[in-house]
A protein has these predicted regions:
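A short linear hydrophobic-aromatic micro-motif
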Residues: 120, 140-143, 174-178, 248-249, ...
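Active-site "cap" helix and flanking loop/linker of ATP-utilizing ligase/carboxylase catalytic domains
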Residues: 230-250, 256, 266-317
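Protein kinase-like catalytic core scaffold
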Residues: 200, 248, 260-264
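Peripheral (often C-terminal) accessory segments that flank ATP-dependent C-N-forming ligase machineries
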Residues: 3, 290-376
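Active-site nucleotide/adenylate-binding loops and adjacent lid/helix of ATP-dependent enzymes
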Residues: 100-188, 192-238, 368
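ATP-binding N-terminal substructure of ATP-dependent carboxylate-amine bond-forming enzymes
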Residues: 1-102, 106, 113, 128, ...
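Short acidic-glycine loop/turn motifs at beta-strand connectors
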Residues: 193-198, 255-258, 357-359
Length: 376
């Protein structure tokens, strides 16, 4: 029985905000942990525990007030979440899955062990090992932080010319090396698994990144059937090896030879799934809540032929003053989601917009028109 279920979310940012919005029609109440008073989720009705995300006492308080604990980002205290599991409460996805994904090297090892396609990689404990890896990777590779890397932060493309400097710039953090992949497209597959193991999958999307941050998402991606089927098969096989319920995002690279390699896994609702709010019968946010509470999963069919999303990022530092939203909403098929963040920072995700239409070209055009009208 899911009536009056209480969900706890570690993190109160925009992802928790959109989960809270989706919770209303499901009869679910939401409580979040977030260190910033008036966090985005609290602005749309979530109760908030003001505390650090990793605060052990706060996490236990959250579990006591709710039936199920989940996350809106993966850099959380998995030891505390495992303690919650040991009290008999449900945590989704499973803490061990979150912990595996937190370490990018163990994530690569997990993928390789399970026969899933991933770029060649090497553990690096010394700069000497990095030099050897660089030789093995034909003189060019990605040097990556194992922990706390996101939106391109914690990655560096290195060659013999800059390896030493890059290694030193990272400082005293754990690193690994990954073969440089000259991809032609970036893809993502959003899927959800319920507590019984049933998996549903959304159409593969294409993502466009600028400065390593997602700029635009096309639902569905402009892909041939072979590539689409291959991506969705890989995503399903990946999900079968993950533990716990909820939405997962599998990010991938497509090469010029139509080879697909997994870039990384996100154990949560994801930026690439935002077009599902307007574009799909069941949004990724509603789907996640259904999955973790034991409800029947919703349809992943599309409501429109095409949906295109664009992120609205900060271009300055200071107080947030959104302008042009009303004008943007006058464009056919456009919806705008502002996250209610008080402070704008360069590169910070302040909102997103989505345009739906009969074709990807039309949706993209309308989205770009709306995007040009909005200032933060």
């Amino acid at each position: 029985m899911t009536e009056n279920k209480k969900i706890g979310i570690v993190g109160g940012g925009q992802l928790a905000m959109m989960m809270t919005e989706a919770s209303r029609e499901l009869g679910i109440s939401v409580t979040v942990i977030d260190p910033t008073p008036g966090c985005p989720a609290s602005l749309v009705g979530a109760r908030q525990i003001v505390a650090d995300y990793n605060d052990l006492t706060a996490i236990h308080e959250l579990s006591e007030k709710t039936d199920v604990v989940t996350i809106d980002f993966e850099h959380v205290n998995t030891t505390a979440l495992q303690q919650v599991v040991e009290t008999g409460k449900s945590v989704h996805p499973k803490p061990q899955t979150i912990a595996m994904i937190q370490d990018k090297l163990t994530q690569c090892e997990f993928l390789e062990f399970n026969g899933l396609p991933v770029a060649d990689f090497k553990r690096l404990d010394t700069v000497e090992e990095a030099h050897k890896a660089l030789t093995d990777f034909d003189g060019k590779m990605l040097l990556k932080m194992r922990h706390q890397s996101y939106d391109g932060k914690g990655n560096a493309v290195v060659s013999n010319d800059n390896l030493e400097d890059a290694w030193n710039n990272f400082g005293n953090v754990k690193l690994y090396g990954e073969a440089f992949i000259p991809f032609v497209k970036e893809l993502a597959v959003i899927l959800a698994r319920d507590t019984e193991g049933t998996i549903v999958i959304y159409p593969t999307v294409e993502t466009i990144h600028i400065n390593n941050i997602c700029h635009k998402v096309f639902l569905p991606g402009d892909l041939n059937d072979t590539v689409r089927e291959k991506a969705e098969t890989i995503a399903m096989k990946t999900a079968e090896h993950l533990e716990g319920a909820g939405v997962f995002a599998i990010e991938m690279f497509l090469t010029k030879d139509d080879e697909i390699l997994i870039n990384e896994i996100a154990p949560r609702v994801h930026n690439s799934g935002h077009p599902t709010i307007e574009g799909s019968v069941t949004s990724q946010f509603e789907q996640h809540l259904r999955a973790v509470t034991g409800m029947i999963l919703g349809s992943t069919d599309m409501k429109h032929n095409a949906a295109v999303m664009i992120n609205i990022l900060g271009k300055r530092n200071g107080s947030a003053e959104p302008k042009g939203v009303e004008k943007a909403l006058e464009i056919e098929g456009v919806s705008v989601h502002m996250y209610g963040k008080h402070e704008v920072k360069i590169g910070r995700k302040m909102g997103h917009l989505t345009a739906v239409a009969d074709t990807l070209e039309e949706a993209s055009s309308h989205a770009e028109q709306a995007f040009e009208l909005i200032e933060i």
